[in-house]
Amino acid sequence: MGDFSNKRVVISGASRGIGLAIAKRLAAEGASIAILAKTAEPHPKLSGTVYTAAEEIVQAGGQALPLITDIRSDDQVQAAVAETVQAFGGIDICINNASAISLTPTAQTEMRRFDLMFGVNVRGTFMLSRECLPHLLEADNPHILNISPPLDMQQKWFAPNVAYTMSKFGMSQCVLGMAGELADKGVAVNALWPHSVIATAAISNVLAGEAALAYCRSPQIMADAAAAILAKDSREFSGNFCIDDVLLAQEGVTDFSVYRMDPEKPLWSDFFVPEDTPEIEPLLAVGNPAP
């Protein structure tokens, strides 16, 4: 799909899950990866730290720079970007993957949770993109990729968890605005979102339980889709809100069974996927058991 040798990547929140899968996918093709994440010590429910992620990236074939970073902190983000440039000599790709989630209605959303989601999802995305931008402008094929949904402004996405939806759509609004702003500068800005729920520790340990993983795809589908986007010409592919399997089908992928956690179970559709999205495989609404 692409050659990422000599590509220098900054990715937030890549100590586990989708972010780590993307980092390892790019590392397998020779990329140097700076991992910006808070987890220095193992979490009681969520496996992986910035240091274990770095080990996996090196094992995959890339270089790794683990950087303990609170994406909400101006000083820490600025320092992390500076360390990346010092270590790698520049930045070609910025991936805004870090995300905070609270699937709660208005009355049950504490303001500290609201501030966390907006601090990580919106402010963190904007700030990391902003700090990387001077270096991206010097790169040959610069990309910003946000792990955020299409801007499908439907009440059904907002009503159950207003604050979370606002924050994720805020990440997508960064794509809409920055893609337009940077179009004449050759910096691509795109979004990538999963069609089905992805099997991560957050799903099994925090949101839906271990049994839910059977209805998911593995993070590898997001990693492969991200690689496909980041291999494209930044001057020709920007401002797109991509769905993982739809994009891969356009790239010629035909066998999606390799991504299923359990081939016997149907897949759950993820939040925020527009109704008119082509179904590459049949999907059920989240939480619906197999028929």
Feature roles, as predicted:
Residues 137, 143-184, 195-198:
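Catalytic loop of short-chain dehydrogenase/reductase
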Residues 7, 62-63, 90-91, 136-150, ...:
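Active-site loop of short-chain dehydrogenase/reductase
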Residues 191-192, 211-291:
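C-terminal helical subdomain
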Residues 105-106, 110-115:
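Substrate-binding pocket helix/loop in short-chain dehydrogenase/reductase
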